[in-house]
Amino acid sequence: MINGIINLKKEAGMTSHDAVFKLRKLLQEKKIGHGGTLDPDVVGVLPIAVGKATRVIEYMTEAGKVYEGQVTLGYSTTTEDASGEVVARSSLPAVLTEELVDQTMTTFLGKITQTPPMYSAVKVNGRKLYEYARTGESVERPRREVTISLFERTSPLNFTEDGLCRFSFKVACSKGTYVRTLAVDLGRALWVESHMSFLQRSASAGLTLETAYTLGEIADMVSKQEMSFLLPIEYGVADLPKMVIDDTELTEISFGRRLSLPSQEPLLAAFHGEKVIAILEKRDQEYKPKKVLI
């Protein structure tokens, strides 16, 4: 069995499920999962867990993400991104400066509440929102709280001859953030229709775009029996607090027994030497093995 983490660079036009399906065929391994869905049009880092590493994929999914993208001011779309149909147009504000945009972006920092887009996989009454959208049905969408730790403009404002304005941005956010909704809400705050015209995930769960591999690159390496794209399972717990345990504690964990450890964290990644051997969960004043990986 193959075990480990893959830092996959998902390409546009492919769902996260498509990527997993292709890797299962390529690696001839059924036990593969991904750590955080990317929309088909979004490119970038998609953490993949293989074999035993699938047991820690949930901790990669919970980790924060970093995205780089582009906002277009001047019209909105059905999907809140460039793939949708135009639903409304508006003139740019009489005064639209980089200083105004920057100041407005800072108002989104911290905890904010979002309404998921209709074209999303969020479920309401057992059905995904995009299923309602495709049949023209309206449904009340559940609002969710997310955290934005960074939201900044990374390019000058680019005014076009057809009355639009585009600029690039970078955002660091919590799990569950809809960046296209962030682009739309930014436009509303500037009193103009808007949508997200491009997006890529540049980092997720400690993995970065610079070190990611495309499916084509992985296929080429596999054909040469080269597996260096496969990272150790320890990458899957990079966002969890680390606790190094001794030989006695290792034995206790292997028998599923509780430990008294000097920590108040709700979850710990227990390491013996350089190897992660368990995920420990705080129970009362002790830590109980939640997942034993040895």
From Swiss-Prot:
Organism (species): Streptococcus pyogenes serotype M28 (strain MGAS6180)
Reported function: Responsible for synthesis of pseudouridine from uracil-55 in the psi GC loop of transfer RNAs.
UniProt key word Lipid metabolism: no
EC number: 5.4.99.25
NCBIfam families documented for this protein: TruB
Leading EC class: isomerase
Active-site residues from the entry: 39
Reactions catalysed according to its record: uridine(55) in tRNA = pseudouridine(55) in tRNA
Full protein name: tRNA pseudouridine synthase B
Signal peptide: none
Family the UniProt entry places it in: Belongs to the pseudouridine synthase TruB family. Type 1 subfamily.
Protein origin, superkingdom: Bacteria
Swiss-Prot/TrEMBL keywords: Isomerase, tRNA processing
Annotated GO MF terms: RNA binding; tRNA pseudouridine(55) synthase activity
